[in-house]
């Protein structure tokens, strides 16, 4: 403890030796060369973040006095808010090395570099490893001149350091015995033989050197470089040059080990006193900047370095003939033997220079070291310029920072290390996904190479803004899809792809690339569409005329440009007048039909630079294009402005307008019109300028040059090729649904609404019947048949005489009640008798019709009319249509009255009951017709058209039934209905047959065509009657379309009353299930209706698996008029909500 107490007096002379760069050579001595001195330990040092008393080595008193003279007696503690650069300068100027033993409690969540050794993910790079100081935050600092750098490097190479660690882990995580060993290896300890125990066991010697790294890397004037000749943190590579300053001395290994153990105990005691939370919080605030090792960010141990004058008492610990310590700064981590084995393997890989996957992978130590998000943004994200994210600037910046030799060495060693790591991972966890990712990455790299070859052939630079954006988007798409792994750097991919592209172009300049582009040309008439095509191919391929439209049909122009097959679809010119939009629609219809054969990759919309329409005069034309092709056409469009050499007009002040301003105004005008018709104000279509006049200025190569100096043809083709390249990458990475063959402009075909179509498929439909079967029983008559009873209850009743009103007044109250009950019973029995007679009559008519069909006799239509009294011969008024309640005094029912005439076509108006127009609420009309085909097949046609101010709805249905045996009927139908803005065409067929007397089964198929997509499905339904009162219907089906599937089914159980349909008592329980995209929807509903006296009560309730439901009760009566008062409840509730604000959220729902 005496030695530790002496250390307390060593923490107050920190800044006395800051300017030792110009001092005597005594201040440049290394730790290993300092003579033995006494050691003092004391209390907590304010300069130490962890609160440990640092171990300080002092120089001679003469040197201390000389330094004190230069400093003027100023004393300041290191770590009191100064920057890492200042700490490094102080370290360079220091004549001593003052170091703290590593704390046994490293930082939480990760292993400290000094307490636990170097992180597992850091690779030992052998003799050429560098450790850089990454100071991105100080980009604005001006580097010192060469002399200052040399001085700094010289100072830092002989500098000493103090290492300390913060106490931030819990006491449970500490292992003092193990930590003692790690601390012994982490610090430069003397050994009588000059070799550590580890080096004796391994039979090798690992040496490291810490010195100032003065490189060309920006923002790194004070960086650190890890060499191969050092003995630890405190040793220096220039000790030999300054050896004459001090006498050779040897550190006593046992004394150093004892000091280490004692310091550890002090650290544990301080940690127990201060607590974990406060300590860790303080350390987080004092964390300095970062160290970057081969683009890998780790925590900087800057707070462990201090500079203090040497205490003479510490010289007693030094031997006069101490040898340099050769203890290596080894990596210490969990699984020590495994780490050493991995280090050996990595060293072998570095020596052999093997690369993994042609240099694609690289150890991503940034993630292993746990770099923060802000650091990732400052280190990885490319700069955002006016043209968007630029990858080239990032590549140039990173390449310029590292010397060529350093980059080559680091790349080789990183690839070798990553090869070892990836191989080990594959052996442990083999996965097919790795192979798929590598294959996808290779294909994407081929796309990059192809694009760069196109760029070289067009004479463009890889630093072009368009090229940079394409490469950036390819990298971004790859990372989003998972193709970019953590061992993969975009800079390396670009360099490799660019080198391959240049090599292939140098060997095969005339080779035809596996690349083709189809371009659709649209625009006004006379703007120069065909002339531009001729200019691109440098030959006359399209007919042009300066005075009349030359292109009257849609046709293809195919040619080869720079080894690339380019196909243009030339179209007739469009007229921009509102009255000519019909003409434009016909042309667009022909174009749409033509491009179904081959979908274009890009659309060029042409307009003239010198013809500007005001106040959105082109909107009608652009809207016609949008209505025909959809809004997706504008997301793949490049705006081309011809006659680009036109002189700019005069400005508002009478002076000629600048050319760039004129181009910007004209481009903005066209882009704004496109945004308006596309409905997306964020849309920004690229603009390309074109000049086809023979007198256009040209360069030495004969290429036409615009007034702004741009060669327009390579620029236009680069935009087209870039769009096609991005489309290929999208197809490869499957970022979104690709367009179906023949679908124009890469539009995403919408998936049909399968749940809606499946619900329509599962719906039961009634079978059509012949006219002579209309009076026959309904489809469910067999289920409703009742056995004839042996007697008629109504006939067995005694005689009954009705009482007059005067006689009822003479009866008492009880007698009047008994009379009403008797009258109700007789009325019910009479209705039952009539229902039974009706069923018997239907049976007889069914038997007679069956007998007549067997004998081959037909039932004349006029005979049926005679039996029915010929009701169709005389027009009769149809019942009045039920109108919604209104506060108008006039009842406009007469407006909707119509007659049923002898005509077979039935036409009726359609009233919108919820419309705003009460007096004239016609919303559409309905048409129906029933007829028979060849006297055997009943058929029906019905349609309805509705139209309001915004949209129209069309519904059409045609159906026919065909009997092919007893109890077997097939129903076919064709439906047309509006879904959104498209028409859905459905063809359906189903067959019903009787399995048993009380069981019917139905099987059906359907096919729907919607939006260029076909959805097909099947269904199966079974009906069964249990007794006379219970009926069950079970159905299920599946519908598929465009690779998507939907499953559904329903169960319905009906319980009828004993006297149904006379009593109208009915209860229904339903359950429906729908599965689409893995989303299971389950719903249940219950409905019951019954009579309470003369009041009909109807109750409904439904609930689904998402917890939403509804309950409703309805009562209708002609006697209990007081039920109208129930309507006051919602009115009072609304008034209360408005007055007091209660239930506002619920009422809004």
Swiss-Prot record:
UniProt: Mg(2+) binding residues: 530
Membrane topology per record: Single-pass membrane protein
MF terms in GO: GTP binding; GTPase activity; metal ion binding
Textual note on the cofactor: Binds 1 Mg(2+) ion by subunit.
Cofactor(s) the protein requires to work: Mg(2+)
Sequence ranges of Polar residues compositional bias: 406-429
Pfam families membership: AIG1, TOC159_MAD
Gene Ontology, cellular component aspect: chloroplast outer membrane
Biased composition (Low complexity): 152-168
Region (G5): 691-693
Protein's job: GTPase involved in protein precursor import into chloroplasts. Seems to recognize chloroplast-destined precursor proteins and regulate their presentation to the translocation channel through GTP hydrolysis. Probably specialized in the import of nuclear encoded non-photosynthetic preproteins from the cytoplasm to the chloroplast.
Protein name from the UniProt record: Translocase of chloroplast 126, chloroplastic
